[in-house]
A protein has these predicted regions:
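Bacterial N-terminal signal peptides
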Residues: 8-19
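Charge-rich, well-structured scaffold segments of protease-associated domains
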Residues: 92-241, 258, 308-443
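M16/MPP (pitrilysin/insulinase) zinc-metallopeptidase core fold and M16-derived inactive scaffolds
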Residues: 56-118, 184, 295-311
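Positively charged n-region of N-terminal signal peptides that target proteins for export
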Residues: 1-7
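His/Glu-based metal-binding/catalytic segments typifying zinc-dependent metallopeptidases
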Residues: 47-49, 56-59, 242-298
Length: 443
């Protein structure tokens, strides 16, 4: 797993790119906000038909930006290890899941740790029982620990020669400096070397906190059965032990960075200040961002830089939000001979939208994409459980039927007025054979 510009090993990357936080107004989806007898809350959607259940759990404030400064990479290593543990009888948990055809995964992003599960309804109790062991005390073999640590080190070494990852890391370094928001999921070789099995166990004890747990359940199982199984499986998890917080980041915007890399291509990344998800205008920012660089060939940036100027095969942009930091980011791939021209065209296009606004066609395509793309996600049991967790994490209510109206109601006047204040200065980083952007910060 590697910490990519728009991914950050994001568990929800497909959800976010599909626009699954908006909902078609003609879909009738009954979401129940349930509390078990033990006080475990979850959102539940019963889906009859196939005997399948999908469940997603998120443990807040367990992501890699919360890694101790001298243990960077711990969260990623810990979440990759705990699913490879054994039962108290010494049986491989991964093998037990596999034998029953259960899909199970533990992952981490910048903010949170996640557990995903997809199983036949008849195996749900069994699967949750094993998850309860995984989250509390399933033994981790020393040999497996060494193998996983070496694998993560290998990823770090590989990333050191990947131009996209180099660009991302340098952008984080310039924008965030030494703040936790600059951490990479894999950590550093030096920090990872000092991580022990005891650190992994401490991570498990501290971060799998019932008070930080968010759950989404979709499938063919009764609410009563799901509640009973959750109470039994998670009975040994603690409450209140995770007290970690991350403050607001100080953003360094308007700077230029450069990483020398011998290649005929340049990778150029951009970052500007954005707004947090809780901002009442966030949905307007989503529409604007989608129109600018989130619609593939239909986006404003692709039309200008690829179709008209022919200086890139791919340019895109999007909103990036983590705890304490909100950015509008972009990435441009171009030949080293057109890198300067590409940056100038990118900034000129953004400035044009800032001053003149979007046209009606761009707005309509962006709104339609945000509204209609959710249909695909909501038609799938597994992705829908992720959507339910995403909504809870970001403060939405269980009544999802009015969400698409937020996007449909955005007018051309509103988005263009918003663009005047939203689009500002950029920090820019280039990775390539030549410093085409007059960068003063180099690596």
């Amino acid at each position: 797993m590697r910490n990519k510009l728009f991914g950050h090993v994001l568990f929800f990357i497909s959800v976010l790119f599909w626009g699954t936080h908006c909902f078609a107004s003609d879909m009738k989806i009954d979401i129940r906000d349930v509390k078990t007898s033990a006080g475990i809350g979850y959102w539940y959607k019963q889906k009859e038909g196939l005997p399948l259940v999908s469940m997603t759990m998120a443990f807040k404030n367990a992501g890699f930006i919360y890694d101790p400064v001298d243990k960077k990479g711990l969260a990623l290593l810990a979440t990759s290890l705990i699913s490879r543990g054994t039962t108290k009888d010494g049986e491989s948990i991964a093998k037990l899941f596999q034998e029953k055809g259960i899909i199970f995964h533990v992952s981490v992003d910048s903010d949170n740790a996640y557990v995903t599960l997809k199983t036949l309804s008849e195996n749900l109790d069994f699967a949750l029982g094993l998850i309860g062991e995984v989250l509390v005390d399933s033994p981790i073999d020393e040999e497996v620990f060494v193998i996983e640590k070496e694998r993560q080190k290998s990823d770090i070494r590989r990333d050191s020669s990947d131009p996209g990852q180099l660009a991302h890391n340098m952008l984080n370094k310039v924008v965030f400096g030494d703040q936790p928001h600059a951490y990479d999921a894999s950590g550093t070789l030096d920090a990872l070397e000092g991580v022990t099995i005891e650190d992994v166990e401490n991570y498990r004890r501290e971060n799998f906190d019932l008070d930080k747990l968010v759950i989404g359940v979709v499938g063919n199982a009764s609410e009563e059965d799901v509640s009973r199984m959750l109470d039994k499986a998670l009975a040994r998890l603690g409450r209140g032990q995770n007290s970690k917080v991350i403050g607001d980041a100080v953003l360094n915007i308007g700077l230029r960075g450069y990483v020398a890399y011998d290649s005929p291509q340049s990778v150029i990344v951009f970052a500007a200040k954005s707004i947090p998800r809780k901002d009442p205008k966030y949905h307007v920012a989503e529409v604007l961002s989608s129109a600018l660089g989130g619609m593939g060939l239909s986006s404003v940036l692709m039309q200008e830089l690829r179709e008209k100027l022919g200086i890139t095969y791919n340019v895109r942009s999007g909103l990036y939000n983590v705890e304490g930091a909100s950015l509008f980011q972009g990435i441009l791939f171009t030949d080293k001979t057109t890198a300067r021209k590409g940056v100038e065209a990118f900034l000129r296009t953004v400035q044009s939208v800032k001053e003149k606004g979007l046209d009606k066609r761009a707005l309509e395509i962006a709104r339609a994409k945000l509204v209609s793309s959710t249909l695909f996600s909501l038609s799938r049991t597994s992705s829908m459980s992720q959507v339910l967790v995403y909504l809870q994490l970001h403060g939405f209510s269980a009544d999802i039927h009015n969400y698409s109206a937020r996007y449909e109601s955005v007018t051309l006047e509103e988005v263009n007025e918003f663009a005047k204040n939203f689009l500002g200065d950029f920090t820019i980083v280039e990775v390539g054979a030549e410093n085409n952007i007059d960068a003063t910060i180099t690596s």
